[in-house]
Design a protein with these regions (language model features):
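A conserved hydrophobic secondary-structure block that centers on an alpha-helix together
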Residues: 136-199
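Active-site-adjacent substrate-binding region
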Residues: 185, 195-196, 213-216, 232, ...
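Sec-dependent N-terminal signal peptides
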Residues: 4-14
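Noncatalytic luminal/extracellular "stalk/propeptide" segments of secretory-pathway proteins
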Residues: 24, 30, 46, 50-164
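Acidic/histidine-rich catalytic neighborhood of metal-dependent amide-processing enzymes
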Residues: 179, 259-262, 285-376, 459
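Soluble metallo-hydrolase cores and metallopeptidase-like ectodomains found primarily
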Residues: 25-27, 103-104, 113-114, 118-145, ...
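Second-shell loop/turn segments in exported
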Residues: 28-36, 50-60, 97, 118, ...
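N-terminal capping segment at the start of a domain
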Residues: 23-59, 96, 204-207, 212, ...
C-alpha cells in the first residue's frame, strides 16, 4: 500500500513538474511570437534615432529623449512612471574637426579625425607639431620628456584581430584613448592622436570618453581619434619619413554640470512587490551618429520588456522596473545616482539586466552571481535553447547596473553577436540604417524571457 501511495505521489510530482515546464515554455513562445509579429522596438528606435538623433549628456537632444522616453512609458499604462534627477557633465564638440599630415612645404594630406569626449580645444588657428608613433605607455615612458616635449603622440595600438570576443579586444586597447592624453601631457606633449577602437579599416573616426586625471588645466592637451585608414596611412608615412608634422584643429569645450534625468517605469509585483527586477540601457549617446546601436537598441529593448509583459496580460510576482539611464558615455552619473537613491530607500534589487552591446543577434547572457545563484540560472537554459540563446556565462554585466553590485543582487548583460559592433561604436555610421529589425526584436524577446524566468523562480 505504501509503495502504491509513493508511486502515485511520485507520478503526480513528475506530472506537476512537466506541467509547469510546459507552461513556462508556452509563455516564452508567446513572448517571442509577440516580439517578432507585434513588436514596437523597431518603430521606437526609428523615432529615437531619426527624429531625435545623437543624445550627448547635457544637450538639447538628450532632454528631448528624456521627454520622449517618459511619454512612451506613460502610454504603456504602467503602475508608475517618473523622472529621477541627475546632474551630468556638459561637453560640446563645436565645429567639426580638421586634421592633416604635413609632408613638406605646401604639401599635406587630410585625414578623418574627431575630438575625444572631454578633450579641450586646440588654439583657434590649430596646432602644428612633429608627430611620434608609439604602441603603448611603456614606449612613451622610454622616450622620456626630451623626446616627447612639444610633439604630437600618435597612439597606434590596433584592436587584436585574433580575439573572437571583440569586447576583449577593445579592453586591450581602450586605455590609450582614456588615459593617453594625461600620460603624454605629463611628458610635455602638445596633443595626442589615437587610433580608433575599430577592427575594420574604414574612414570613420570613433570618439569616446577620455580623462585628464588630476592634471591642472594649464597642462591639459587636445586629444583626437583618427580613423583606422587614417592611422594606417600616417603609420606608413612615418615609416618612410620620421620627421613628419601633423596639424589638428578642434574647438570643443567643457561646461559646468547641468541637470538631467533618468526615466523610470514599473509594474508592481503582485506577490513580492518589494523584490525589484530592473532592466535598462543608457539613453544618452555620442553625438557623431544617431546612437542606434549604442545604446538606442538597448533602450527600446528594455522598454519592450515591459510592453510585451503587459501585452500578454502577465501579472508579475515581483516588481519589474525599466530604467533609461542618463550619462553612461561620459560620466556614469545615471547609474551611480540610481544605485545611490535605491540604497537610501533600502530597496531590495534581486536582479538587474542591461542591454548595451548593440542590437545584433542575441547569443546569450553573462552573469555576476554566486555559485548557488548561477546554478539556478543554468537550470533555465533549456527554456531558451530553442531560440538559440545558448551562452550562459559568468562575467562582467554592464556599466550602468554595476553600482548595484552588493554580493546579493544578480547582475546580467545581454550578449549579442559582437563581430560588427565596433564597426559602428561611437562613430558617425551608428545610425538606424545599421539596425536589423529581426535581430533587434530577437534581443527584446530574449531579455523578456529571462526577466519572466527570474520573476517566476526568483533567487
Amino acid at each position: 500500500m505504501k509503495r502504491t501511495i509513493f508511486a502515485v505521489s511520485f507520478l503526480l510530482f513528475v506530472s506537476l513538474l512537466h506541467s509547469q515546464k510546459t507552461d513556462h515554455t508556452k509563455q516564452i513562445e508567446i513572448i517571442y511570437n509577440l516580439s517578432l509579429t507585434k513588436g514596437k522596438a523597431y518603430n521606437w528606435l526609428d523615432h529615437l534615432s531619426n527624429q531625435i538623433g545623437g543624445r550627448l549628456s547635457g544637450s538639447l537632444n538628450a532632454e528631448r529623449a528624456v521627454f520622449w522616453g517618459k511619454q512612451e512609458l506613460e502610454n504603456l499604462d504602467l503602475d508608475r512612471v517618473y523622472l529621477e534627477d541627475v546632474m551630468v557633465p556638459k561637453w560640446v564638440r563645436g565645429t567639426f574637426e580638421y586634421a592633416s599630415i604635413i609632408t613638406g612645404p605646401g604639401r599635406s594630406t587630410n585625414v578623418p579625425v574627431c575630438s575625444l569626449g572631454g578633450s579641450i580645444s586646440t588654439p583657434a588657428s590649430g596646432l602644428r607639431a612633429q608627430v611620434i608613433e608609439i604602441r603603448n605607455f611603456e614606449e612613451l615612458e622610454s622616450l622620456g620628456e626630451e623626446n616627447v616635449k612639444d610633439k604630437f603622440i600618435f597612439y597606434n595600438r590596433a584592436m587584436p584581430a585574433g580575439l573572437i570576443n571583440t569586447f576583449e579586444a577593445y579592453s586591450k586597447t581602450v586605455n590609450q584613448r582614456s588615459q593617453g592624453a594625461e600620460k603624454a601631457a605629463r611628458l610635455g606633449a602638445v596633443g595626442v592622436i589615437v587610433r580608433s577602437m575599430n577592427l575594420r579599416l574604414d574612414d570613420y573616426p570613433h570618439t569616446g570618453n577620455m580623462r585628464y586625471g588630476n592634471l591642472p588645466n594649464k597642462m591639459r592637451i587636445p586629444a583626437a581619434a583618427i580613423s583606422t585608414n587614417g592611422a594606417q596611412l600616417l603609420s606608413s608615412m612615418l615609416s618612410l619619413n620620421n620627421d613628419l608634422y601633423f596639424y589638428l584643429k578642434q574647438d570643443c569645450k567643457n561646461f559646468p554640470d547641468v541637470p538631467s534625468n533618468n526615466v523610470i517605469g514599473e509594474i508592481k509585483g503582485s506577490e513580492f512587490p518589494n523584490e525589484i527586477i530592473v532592466v535598462g540601457g543608457h539613453l544618452d549617446s555620442w553625438d557623431l551618429g544617431d546612437g542606434a546601436h549604442d545604446d538606442g537598441a538597448g533602450i527600446v529593448q528594455s522598454m519592450e520588456v515591459l510592453r510585451l509583459l503587459k501585452k500578454m496580460n502577465y501579472k508579475p510576482k515581483r516588481t519589474i522596473r525599466v530604467v533609461l539611464y542618463m550619462n553612461e558615455e561620459n560620466g556614469l552619473r545615471g547609474g551611480t545616482t540610481y544605485a545611490k537613491n535605491a540604497k537610501s530607500r533600502k530597496e531590495n534589487h534581486i536582479f538587474a539586466l542591461e542591454s548595451d552591446a548593440g542590437g545584433f543577434t542575441p547569443r546569450g547572457f553573462v552573469f555576476e552571481a554566486t555559485k548557488k545563484q548561477f546554478n539556478k540560472i543554468k537550470s533555465w537554459k533549456s527554456y531558451l535553447g530553442p531560440y538559440m540563446i545558448d551562452r550562459f556565462e559568468l562575467g562582467g554585466s554592464g556599466a550602468d547596473i554595476g553600482p548595484l553590485r552588493n554580493g546579493n543582487t544578480v547582475l546580467s548583460g545581454l550578449r549579442p553577436d559582437s563581430q560588427r559592433y565596433f564597426d559602428y561604436h561611437h562613430a558617425a555610421n551608428d545610425t538606424f540604417e545599421a539596425i536589423n529589425k529581426r535581430e533587434l526584436e530577437l534581443g527584446a524577446a530574449a531579455m523578456t524571457s529571462l526577466i519572466y524566468l527570474v520573476d517566476q523562480f526568483g533567487f
